[in-house]
Amino acid sequence: MSATPTPTLRPSTVADLETHVAHRVAMFQDMEMGTEEGRKRMAESFRHQLRSWLVTGQCRGLVLEENGRSVASVLLLLKETLPTPVTPLSVRGYLFNVYTVPSHRRRRLAARLTDSALDLARELGIEIVELHASLEAEGLYQRMGFVPTSEMRLVMSAGIKTPKQWKHRR
């Protein structure tokens, strides 16, 4: 009986763009958020935005590979924000697109990626990292030290239906 291989961690490059796009689409599909058409439109817009962020270094990514296949990935956006009394720094980390393919779930790969992304944030001097957790991943992030905040959101377009995942969860 052979042991389960341990996926190899490496930094993302622009060559991983389609992996990150596919993982984002799959993530929202898994959460049953949006329609197939809406996810297609999102993918096109995201592809353009992420390419720009990866090229400029505003976004850093990590990929876990096994046998040459990307099985999990994460992105860390360096987000301009306002200084606060908590920290005078005007850049925060925004962790997003944490995704593991279904065949590799329950192996703590999301935790490994998140830990590695937080290490990267520390190396970059980031003092605060934010994220939006799916219901399924909320417990993982709370165990890692993330806390719910007072963030609120207003949908300004009549054409946008508020997803059930945005409902208050505290």
Which stretches of residues belong to each language-model region?
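A short helix-loop-beta-strand connector motif used in the catalytic cores of GNAT acetyltransferases and
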Residues: 48-63, 94
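A short beta-loop-alpha structural element at the N-terminal edge
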Residues: 8-22
